[in-house]
Swiss-Prot record:
Keywords: Kinase, Transferase. PANTHER family: ACTIN-FRAGMIN KINASE DDB_G0279609-RELATED. It comes from the Eukaryota. GO terms for biological process: sexual reproduction. This is Putative actin-fragmin kinase DDB_G0279609.
Length: 419
């Protein structure tokens, strides 16, 4: 059953209930391309309204997202293994019929005591999510994704930028260990996992030490790249649009130096399109994919650093080839396509490469039109004051310090150069 939200037409954003010291990445109710930040006390809401000219100077930031579609929510291979047992709880004892099971994904007002199962979801490139399933007294199942990381700050920063660009990211919020809800979450996760899976229990115990968790919306029926029927998926209905959308994602990855997805600019990348879920049915904004995790990896901000110069040079090279001959497959795209074809024993034609190439061009144009140096700087400043208490290892501060704005600024200038 789809999650239903009611919006007021005259408001840009949903009214958000106070959730102390949380970060929420929320859907915008207005498709306006203008962007501005508004305050929500003790929260960071990710909305599609960011002001390029001036982001308000306070301790909160609002950024947006285009959440994945929850259409046709059914059990899939990623669902928990004991759903069949849970279904039996819905059996009507009087007539032996089953009460229809209702599934949804709501990251707010979670009753952690209603947790009935937790399992792992591996999206590649060492990114592990937890699928938490809750059962309320109305026989409704709520499923959310949980994720912690040693690079949580960089991931939140990337999600903010994705939201500004209206890329397809799930609704999410940040939960820090100083919040009482973190204790409730920890207790429930450890209690459930200790009864079913010792290795999972040990894994969760270690993850909880990282002090910050993302609670994310979960839309079932998504597939990882390696699980796709490539010929049917990319040559069938909407095939060209899907490839074009991948290109837009690649453009963002180039800007953020996010090497987790494919070997286009980066050396020795073993994964292809990791951290992306692919759907047969597009969401309400027309996206067939959902970006489950992104990162910003800034090279040292000295222009004299070898790695710094090498990366900027590679970006210039690929952008020059793409913008000079957009309808002819570049050598870089061809190399990427052949690498994917070899790894998965599939035949992606040069026309597929050109579709991806055109998507990259569109993505670059989008970045130039919606991202500015002031937004990059102000977003970092907002995140600096987001959490109430940093971890004992100062993970939040260290993450922020690793986001070198001169590097991102140079990449933005490089893209403008070829636009």
């Amino acid at each position: 059953m789809n999650k239903i939200k009611v919006f007021k037409k005259n408001f840009f954003f949903e009214k958000i209930k106070n959730k102390k010291n949380n970060i929420e990445i929320k859907k915008s109710t207005n498709d306006s391309t203008s962007n501005t930040c508004t305050d929500i006390k003790n929260n960071i809401i990710i909305e599609n309204k960011i002001n390029e000219e001036n982001i308000e100077n306070n301790n909160n930031i609002n950024i947006g997202n285009n959440s994945v579609n929850n259409n046709n929510i059914n059990n899939n291979n990623n669902s928990i293994n004991n759903n069949n047992n849970n279904n039996n709880k819905n059996k009507n004892k009087n007539n032996n019929s089953y009460i229809p099971m209702i599934q949804y994904s709501n990251i707010h007002c979670i009753d952690w005591s209603s947790l009935i199962s937790v399992d792992k979801l591996d999206l590649g490139s060492s990114n592990i999510f937890l699928i938490a399933t809750f059962l309320n007294n109305k026989c409704e199942y709520n499923q959310v994704l949980l994720k912690s990381s040693t690079t949580i700050v960089q991931e939140v920063y990337a999600s903010v930028l994705e939201s500004i660009l209206k890329l397809p990211i799930p609704e999410m919020r940040l939960l820090e260990y100083s919040n009482d809800e973190y204790i409730q979450m920890s207790r429930s996760l450890l209690t459930i996992s200790s009864k079913t899976n010792k290795s999972l229990y040990d894994y969760i115990k270690l993850e909880l030490l990282k002090s910050f968790f993302l609670i994310m919306e979960y839309a079932p029926n998504g597939k990882s790249f390696k699980d796709l029927d490539y010929k049917e998926y990319f040559s069938g209905y909407g095939g060209e649009k899907k490839l074009n959308q991948l290109g837009q994602v690649i453009a963002f990855d180039i800007f953020c130096n996010n090497s987790d997805r494919l070997p286009l600019i980066w050396d020795n990348v073993s994964s292809h399109f990791s951290n992306i879920l692919f759907y047969d049915i597009p969401n309400r904004n027309g996206w067939y994919i959902s970006l489950m995790n992104s990162n910003v990896t800034c090279i040292n901000n000295s222009s004299f650093t070898i790695g710094y110069r090498k990366y900027i040079t590679r970006v210039k090279s690929i952008l020059y080839a793409l913008f000079k001959r957009p309808n002819i497959e570049s050598n870089q795209i061809k190399k990427m396509r052949e690498s994917i074809s070899k790894s998965y024993k599939i035949n992606l034609s040069s026309s597929c490469g050109i579709s991806i190439q055109r998507g990259i061009i569109q993505g670059v144009q989008l970045i130039i039109s919606r991202i500015s140096i002031s937004i990059l700087s102000d977003t970092k400043e907002k995140l600096r004051h987001l959490v109430k208490v940093d971890s004992t290892t100062n993970a939040w501060k260290k993450g922020l310090d690793s986001i070198h704005l001169p590097f991102l600024s140079d990449l933005l200038d490089t893209m403008v150069l070829f636009y």
